[in-house]
From Swiss-Prot:
Cell wall formation. Belongs to the MurCDEF family. It catalyses: UDP-N-acetyl-alpha-D-muramate + L-alanine + ATP = UDP-N-acetyl-alpha-D-muramoyl-L-alanine + ADP + phosphate + H(+). It comes from the Bacteria. Disulfide bonds: none annotated. Pathway: Cell wall biogenesis; peptidoglycan biosynthesis. The lineage of its organism: Bacteria, Bacillati, Bacillota, Bacilli, Bacillales. NCBIfam families: murC (TIGR01082). Its EC number is 6.3.2.8. ATP binds at residues 108-114. One of its GO terms (molecular function) is ATP binding. This is UDP-N-acetylmuramate--L-alanine ligase. SUPFAM superfamilies: MurCD N-terminal domain, MurD-like peptide ligases, catalytic domain, MurD-like peptide ligases, peptide-binding domain. The gene is murC.
Length: 437
């Protein structure tokens, strides 16, 4: 049996793909840096071997699946070529693998992971479903009918896929280290649209997505009356959100979701639209929506005493606004304290004022040093540049995390795509120590 070796196994796409292959009965191992990432937990639960990067990890007879962040001159990839081991990039492997299923690719600047998790949960209540989610979780089923996957636009990686369905949640300017402008982003989505085989499910409230041209039907969802699937009569409470769905102006069904914020309604509409297209009944959809528990690092709550700590992956101004809106709905009478760690210097520079504006929607904002990516470790600006634009903000470190204790009974939003979890871990330790003191 071939051993699949994942170079960069802790990656947000690589980890779930390794889980999927393992669940399908394949022999899997991988390597990465010797640093904890939340994506490794499900790997360890399966006892999948994880090594530190080393050329000696590569043996004859393996197939190496290489993460997109690692160049061809990575020591493991050099060794693989030296001994004639096949190397296949993550997105190319996945593009070939999904051909065995009814594939549903979820893409968009924001909402990919949440929508993928919800789609997998709902469709999985109808027929066996394999899924790959960007929160580091994946599952494979030997007899799966559907394959639900998160598809990222960065470096146009999603063009390796020819899915049956593409769900497009929105188009927004992000990844400024790669995309030149919004037109460049749009062109990537337009290219993907031409590769879809059955239908495109797109948010019609997004003006960029209204321009999409395709060889297959484009079915629109949203709040606007011009959409094919429309949410009406929205009722927001501290328990969740209830709304009616109309299909081409005819009442379809009423749904309740234990989720918060307008973006959650839109994500759910995307799922409902796909399900209706595949003939899944409203009863099945509603039953599955009721039991949805969310995905990792997307509004993940921890209660300590009368404090609420929320972990969220928000790392773009649009996502920060959505997270704060969700918190306002669920905790309307509580102080909201944002703790934000910017992710990459290029993104921080490109959206500096927009970050300041979005973070100002919280009652108080604390900032952590900028988290550089594997592609960049320093930049021309510092966290002080952002702090100077947010009135009353402060820069914090893990050592000085106890400053947060002055906000008793607050909702603390820990946001970022780097290692912001270490700030939450430090604060949790302080709170638990205070409880036992």
């Amino acid at each position: 049996m071939t051993v699949f070796h994942f170079t960069g196994i802790k990656g947000s796409g690589m980890s779930p793909l390794a889980q999927i292959l393992f669940d399908a009965g394949e022999q899997v191992q991988g390597s990465d840096v010797d640093k904890y990432f939340f994506t490794e937990q499900p790997l360890r639960e399966r006892n999948i071997p994880i090594f530190t990067f080393n050329a000696d990890n590569i043996k004859e007879g393996m197939t190496v699946i290489a993460g997109n962040a690692f160049p061809d001159d990575h020591p493991e990839l050099i060794r693989a070529r030296e001994i004639g081991v096949e190397i296949i990039r993550y997105h190319k492997f996945l593009g070939e693998y999904i051909g065995n299923y009814i594939s549903i690719a979820i893409t968009g600047a924001h909402g990919k992971t949440s929508t993928t998790g919800l789609m997998a949960h709902v469709v999985g209540g109808y027929k066996p479903t394999s899924y790959l989610i960007g929160d580091g979780t994946g599952a494979g089923h030997a007899n799966a009918d559907f394959f639900v996957m998160e598809a990222c636009e960065y470096r146009r990686h999603f063009l390796a896929y020819n899915p049956d369905y593409a769900v497009m949640t929105n188009i927004d300017f992000d990844h400024p280290d790669y995309f030149a402008n919004i037109e460049d982003v749009y062109s990537a989505f337009q290219s993907l649209a031409l590769q879809v085989k059955k239908a495109i499910i797109a948010c019609g409230d997004d003006e960029q997505l209204q321009r999409i041209q395709a060889k297959v039907p484009v079915v629109y969802y949203g709040f606007g009356s011009e959409n094919d699937f429309e949410a009406r009569n929205v009722e927001k409470t501290t328990e969740g959100t209830k709304f009616d769905v109309f299909v081409r102006n005819e009442f379809y069904s009423t749904f309740f979701i234990p989720l918060f914020g307008d973006h959650a309604i839109l994500n759910t509409l995307a799922v409902i639209t796909l399900c209706e297209y595949e003939g899944i009944s409203p009863d099945i959809i509603q039953d599955r929506l009721h039991t949805y528990k969310g995905v990792k690092r997307r509004f993940t709550e921890t209660d300590i005493g009368d404090n609420v700590l929320i972990d969220d992956y928000a790392h773009h101004p649009t996502e920060i606004r959505a997270t704060i809106q969700s918190a306002r709905q669920k905790f309307p009478d509580r102080e909201l304290v944002a703790i934000f760690q910017p992710h990459t210097f290029t993104r921080t520079q490109a959206f500096l004022q927009d970050f300041a504006d979005s973070l100002s929607l919280a009652d108080t904002a604390y900032l952590c040093d900028i988290f550089g990516s594997a592609r960049e470790t320093q930049g021309a600006l510092s966290i002080q540049d952002l702090a100077s634009l947010i009135e009353g903000s402060a820069v914090i470190t893990t050592e000085g995390i106890d400053i947060l204790t002055k906000h008793q009974g607050a909702v603390f939003l820990f946001m970022g795509a780097g290692d912001v979890h270490k700030f939450q871990d430090a604060f949790e330790a302080v709170l638990k120590n205070d409880e036992t003191a």
